[in-house]
Amino acid sequence: MANSLRTLFSVSTHGVFLNKRSSYRVRKVFVGMPLRICSEIPRFVSVSCIRSDMCGIMMLGKDVHDLLETSSGGNVEKGFLRWRNGGGMYHRSALIDSSALVEFGAVVHQEAILGAEVHIGSNTVIGSSVKIGPSTKIGNCSIGDLCVIHNGVCIGQDGFGFYVDDNGNMVKKPQTLNVKIGNRVEIGANTCIDRGSWRDTVIGDDTKIDNLVQIGHNVIIGKCCLFCGQVGIAGSAEIGDFVALGGRVAVRDHVSIVSKVRLAANSCVTKNITEPGDYGGFPAYKKTEPDSAFASDKHCFILQKILIQVPIHQWRRQIVEAQISSKRKP
């Protein structure tokens, strides 16, 4: 066993290295130091690195992204070089601001654009032709091609999860998984997307997200969705395809919304939505009146009908007469 490990790995002061002559397919490697992947790893294999206080954990598996050589000089033959600030890999056609940080273990593909003060953490893959605005922080994340990430976005940070132990102390739950973002996704400024705890947080292809949106851990969002500003989606919620959420819509945790649902602004989803259609209110209910603008109750709906039927000049005259009569002495 020891001899086979020596043929597979070599150890130096810089970490644990996979020998170039080795043709083994490594599935899981647990190491206490950084692991550098050499050129003999098969193509279309990605690295998922989970760091802890005790040791680093690296899992290798198939993915849509190429695993790139991360030797000290980069992989010049494939057009990839090592970024001087952080040691991450980037394609020579990518445009990266000099103040950006690309950590070791991150990969930036061709024609990507990274703005000023961008921080790309380890275990991150930036797809082709992705545009990332200034002051953005991304880690533990896989971003597809042709995505647009606006200023100040945070992707891949810890999710919000705590529990009380036997001693009454508040203990943080481990948040060790990743965020997966599809192709042609646009994310507005100052939006936050948490990484998963028991499953990856996923955003489907062609989904568009406005500014100041919060997406919790373990959330799964389908393709071609539209989220307006200040939407909040709690952890472990599931949203189907072609779903539109108006401004300040709130979705509680562990609920499911089917495809082709539209939610009016300021609505709150407290239970599963199983039928396509238009919803609104608190809690959200399905719109049944064709002319109603999600009236809060029947009286408000009837008053709206009366106001539509009365001419505006007559309505104003009645208001003035009522004000005059109220001022008259008895």
From Swiss-Prot:
The record marks 9 as: Participates in a stacking interaction with the uracil ring of UDP-GlcNAc. Keywords: Acyltransferase, Lipid A biosynthesis, Lipid biosynthesis, Lipid metabolism, Mitochondrion, Transferase, Transit peptide. The active site is at 217 (proton acceptor). One of its GO terms (biological process) is lipid X metabolic process. It catalyses: a UDP-3-O-[(3R)-3-hydroxyacyl]-alpha-D-glucosamine + a (3R)-hydroxyacyl-[ACP] = a UDP-2-N,3-O-bis[(3R)-3-hydroxyacyl]-alpha-D-glucosamine + holo-[ACP] + H(+). Its EC number is 2.3.1.191. The keyword Lipid metabolism applies. Homotrimer. This is Probable UDP-3-O-acylglucosamine N-acyltransferase 1, mitochondrial. It comes from Arabidopsis thaliana (Mouse-ear cress).
